[in-house]
A protein has these predicted regions:
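Beta-sheet repeat architectures centered on beta-propellers
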Residues: 1-74, 309-316, 320-324, 331, ...
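Small/polar beta-strand repeat architecture
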Residues: 7-8, 128-148, 155-163, 170-217
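Beta-propeller and closely related beta-pinwheel folds
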Residues: 55-59, 212-225, 229-358
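Blade-loop segments of beta-propeller domains
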Residues: 63-67, 71, 80, 84-106
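Structural motif
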Residues: 81-84, 117-123, 233-246, 287-293, ...
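Beta-strand initiation motifs
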Residues: 126, 200, 255-257, 297-303, ...
């Protein structure tokens, strides 16, 4: 007698994941990777957790967010045409409405492109490129009868300048008199220079005197000097003096050690950023990097290397965190610790531009723009090497003050790491689960081990075969650390992925899925 045979039962397997490997938006996102993320964090890696809160510390009520800078005593920023210090407008200081470059030395902050200086401790400001024009009297300071002059007299000519300033004269009909000279003394309305500086004595009309300042596009402070770059040129100030950019003093031994310095690097393209590191200053173009060596103008030199530079609109992305320089390059986020830069952003899976960045000491926060006209705030954890994506926060600048990280957007200045997360909307979407097999499978159940704050909730959903439809499994309310099993209506599929959406603060400690094989595709 022939008896029917029953089909062999397909094996049931259970896979438990406790290591969530951060954000990975590539098509080949591995099992365990997180393909999409909103308001997540790698702080508790290998666990997944939601990000800390943010607080709008200084609301500005709209206006162009033009730059944020940290100084002793607080935060300095520009919104529209107004300069603010710790939330208070600087009375009388009206700037051009546009992005700012800040640098500070000795308590004096320089602001480009306005070429304004500001002293936060005194609340004073002025032009960093003062100028005077009019008729001058060229004379000799010793009242002798020589033919050449060393002094310039005119009403008000002394007001904009200081003893020791290097000032530039223009307007002379005798070309040899046009040039830059150092003021040796000021006697009332008389500027005194080196003997026989000018070719003749007498009155001269239409003369302009200026203490010049370069129009920098990027700037930083290192070794008691401000360093700046633009186009193909690098400058630094006189040692200890943020207002002296063309002070080229020399003696019998050559250029003095305190003199200013500048150089044209002579390569195509414009500088796109600079930064001070523990070992020196680095200047970058999109396709190259220059490191500064030397201790004084006589031995300063820039050594070039063909390496990943800074993306042309990402000069604000250069940040030193954990003794490493991070920045957005044309090929994506990169880092260097003194050697050749390496890419670290392949997991982001997209091209990024217009980056601005900051650090809280261990994490690098990057706000950048993608080709789909979307903004993202990505966070790179320097300890674990994992990425996370927070949201669409569009920061124009970051600053760190008293150990806290701040960022500026059109609504004002935000403090990171504080504030309520009770209404925080978050999302985690896994990559495709294929369970190491090209055959079909059926998902039988999902088990989550969660920890959530009071008032928080998490909803789980599944999608099959990339059909765009999410099937809700269950919603889990807040609670202490616990496991929750979610039943699934089995469905034969080639692959599937899971999505967790939450409100409030929560952590995912493990994700277990029970599956059975469902035979090959036909």
């Amino acid at each position: 007698m022939h008896l029917p045979t029953f089909p062999r039962a397909m094996p049931v397997t259970r896979r438990v994941q406790t290591d969530f490997r951060g954000y990975d938006h590539r098509p080949g996102c591995p099992e365990g990777g997180i393909y999409e993320m909103t308001n997540g964090s790698a702080t508790d890696a290998p666990l997944f957790s939601t990000r800390p809160g943010r607080t709008l510390t200084y609301p500005t009520g709209g206006g162009s967010a033009n730059g944020l800078f940290a100084v002793d005593g607080g935060l300095l920023w520009c919104t529209g045409q107004t300069l603010y210090f710790n939330g208070t407008p600087v009375d009388g200081c009206t700037l051009v409405n546009g992005p700012k470059v800040f640098a500070e030395l000795g308590g004096t902050v320089l602001i480009w492109p306005d070429k304004v200086w500001y002293r936060p401790d005194m609340g004073t400001f002025g032009s960093a490129e003062p100028s005077w024009s009019g008729t001058v009297a060229l004379q000799r300071s010793d009242d002798s009868s020589g033919a050449r002059a060393d002094s310039v007299a005119a009403n008000g000519i002394d007001t904009p300048f200081r003893v020791g300033d290097a000032v530039t004269f223009s307007g002379f009909s005798t070309p040899e008199d046009n040039g830059t000279y150092i003021i040796r003394a000021i006697a009332g309305a008389v500027l005194v220079f080196d003997p026989d500086t000018f070719s003749a004595v007498g009155a001269v009309e239409h003369i302009t005197v200026t203490r010049r300042m370069p129009l920098a596009l990027h700037a930083c402070t290192y070794a008691n000097r401000i360093w700046a770059c633009a186009q193909d040129t690098v400058w630094c100030t006189k040692l200890g003096d943020p207002l002296s950019w063309y002070w080229y003093e020399a003696d019998e031994n050559g250029t003095v050690a305190t003199a200013a310095w500048s150089v044209d690097v002579g390569t195509p393209g414009n500088f796109s950023g600079c930064a001070a590191t523990g070992s020196g200053v680095v200047f970058l173009k999109p396709d190259g990097l220059w490191r500064l060596y030397g201790t004084k103008p006589d031995n300063f030199q820039l050594i070039a290397s063909a390496a990943l530079g800074t993306e042309k609109n990402s000069g604000r992305s250069l940040v030193t965190a954990a003794e490493t320089l991070y920045y957005l390059s044309p090929a994506g986020p990169a880092r260097t610790s003194g050697g050749r830069p390496v890419r670290i952003g392949d997991a982001l899976g997209r091209t990024l531009t217009a980056g601005a960045a900051g650090t809280d000491g261990t994490r690098w926060y990057l706000s950048a723009h993608d080709p789909q006209n979307a903004w993202h705030l990505f966070v790179y954890d320097t300890r674990s090497g994992l990425w996370s994506r927070e949201d669409a926060f569009h920061a124009s600048g970051f600053a760190r003050h008293d150990g806290a990280l701040y960022a500026q957007d059109p609504s004002g200045v935000w403090r990171f790491g504080t504030g309520s997360t009770a209404q925080l909307e978050s999302m985690l979407e896994t990559g495709d689960f294929v369970s190491g097999s090209p055959d079909c499978k059926r998902l039988l159940r999902v088990q989550l081990r969660l920890e959530a704050d009071a008032g928080a909730s998490v909803t789980a959903a599944v999608q099959y075969d990339s059909d765009g439809v999410w099937h809700t499994l269950a919603t889990v309310a807040a609670g202490a650390k616990r496991s929750v099993t979610l039943p699934v209506l089995p469905r034969r599929c080639d692959h599937f992925r899971l999505r967790l959406t939450g409100t409030g603060a929560w952590r995912l400690l493990s994700l277990a899925r029970t599956e059975t094989a469902a035979g090959p595709q036909h």
